[in-house]
Swiss-Prot record:
The modification Phosphoserine is found at residue 350. Pathway: Carbohydrate degradation; glycolysis; D-glyceraldehyde 3-phosphate and glycerone phosphate from D-glucose: step 4/4. The lineage of its organism: Eukaryota, Viridiplantae, Streptophyta, Embryophyta, Tracheophyta. Its EC number is 4.1.2.13. Fructose-bisphosphate aldolase that plays a key role in glycolysis and gluconeogenesis. This is Fructose-bisphosphate aldolase 8, cytosolic. Keywords: Acetylation, Cytoplasm, Glutathionylation, Glycolysis, Lyase, Membrane, Methylation, Mitochondrion, Mitochondrion outer membrane, Phosphoprotein, S-nitrosylation, Schiff base. InterPro entries: Aldolase_I_AS, Aldolase_TIM, FBA_I. Pfam families: Glycolytic. Belongs to the class I fructose-bisphosphate aldolase family. Disruption phenotype: Sterility.
């Protein structure tokens, strides 16, 4: 049997293509309450609902930012939240031409029988939740699987388990009208070289697309959110051109042309690094049947967060910092970023957190 055809097939295909529009990308603002608490703590702001809402309102109403975006990933709390003047965030995004998305996984747990590898929870009741999220205005979803590189990792067991979970999630989303973002993140932690990362990335993506095929997922109505192929965090850095070459080659070998767009995660790179690497990929003269874009969280928000510091009088400057990063990444999706963005506070600092939990 070929791809499963849901009653939403045409809508899924149109929305996936829209999210992949060159010149646009995704703002990942789906941090769990615990994770956003750590971000707020870094600027000495208390983790209460009002402050979380204030930060998200700052992001979603920043002048000039929304035209650079095609989607924003929300945490469940934010899907139902309103701005200070009583307007649903979902409506603010839609009016700005941005599709709302929703994080649907329930985090990772250790995979029994492995050396600290993980699997992602959240399949129980997923169909009902997707239906509810669609009714609330969400049009795409995200599920993060996490793999690590070690002497014997990732194991075949971990690769298979995570690929299967992603495929199961993807088909359930499509049954309920949500475009699934398939995110198999290979953590940057370690001292491995770029060749090792490339080999592991190819193995993981090949397994994911085999699982998606086995589950009859409509590839035209999906997006891929992979890591860039880079050396490990404890290894010497390489140039954006080298990262671009290894990343695009790994994708050419594994990602079917039916997939409309690949939206990279930033994986703890600095804001500027992530943008330069994406730009280098789009400048590569080679076969790329999918658009290459971004789905950045930390790499879009860091300088904004530092500029804001929880103070009302800093909102305008913080929104300007967000616009600068959105514009830079918009240009990077077209391969036209000149590296001339005004670097905000924190734009050049590494955002790597070992064993990162979202």
């Amino acid at each position: 049997m070929s791809a499963f055809t849901s009653k939403f097939a045409d809508e899924l295909i149109a929305n996936a293509a829209y999210i992949g529009t060159p010149g646009k990308g995704i703002l990942a603002a789906d941090e769990s309450t615990g994770t956003i608490g750590k971000r707020l703590a870094s600027i000495n702001v208390e983790n209460v609902e009002t402050n979380r809402r204030n930060l998200r309102e700052l992001l979603f109403t920043a002048p000039g930012a929304l035209p650079c975006l095609s989607g924003v990933i929300l945490f469940e709390e934010t899907l139902y939240q309103k701005s200070s003047d009583g307007k649903l965030f979902v409506d603010i995004l839609k009016e700005g031409g941005v599709l709302p998305g929703i994080k649907v996984d329930k985090g990772t747990v250790e995979l029994a029988g492995t050396d600290g590898e993980t699997t992602t929870q959240g399949l129980d009741g997923l169909g009902d939740r997707c239906k509810k999220y669609y009714e609330a205005g969400a049009r795409f979803a995200k599920w993060r699987a996490v793999l690590k590189i070690g002497e014997n990792e990732p194991s075949e067991h971990s690769i298979h388990e995570n690929a299967y979970g992603l495929a199961r999630y993807a088909v359930i989303c499509q049954e309920n009208g949500l475009v699934p973002i398939v995110e198999p993140e290979i953590l940057v932690d370690g001292s491995h070289d770029i060749q090792k990362c490339a080999a592991v990335t190819e193995r993981v993506l090949a397994a994911c697309y085999k699982a998606l095929s086995d589950h009859h997922v409509l590839l035209e109505g999906t997006l891929l959110k992979p890591n860039m192929v880079t050396p490990g965090s404890d290894s010497p850095k390489v140039s954006p051109e080298v990262i671009a070459e290894h990343t695009v080659r790994a994708l050419q070998r594994t990602v079917p042309a039916a997939v409309p767009a690949i939206v990279f995660l930033s994986g703890g790179q600095s804001e500027e690094e992530a943008t330069r690497n994406l730009n280098a990929m789009n400048q590569l003269k080679t076969k790329k049947p999918w658009s290459l874009s971004f789905s950045f969280g930390r790499a879009l928000q860091q300088s904004t967060l530092k500029t804001w510091a929880g103070k009302e009088e800093n909102v305008k400057a913080a929104q300007e910092a967000l616009y600068v990063r959105c514009k830079a990444n918009s240009e990077a999706t077209l391969g036209t970023y000149k590296g001339d963005a005004k670097l905000g506070d924190g734009a050049a600092e590494s955002l790597h957190v070992k064993d990162y939990k979202y």
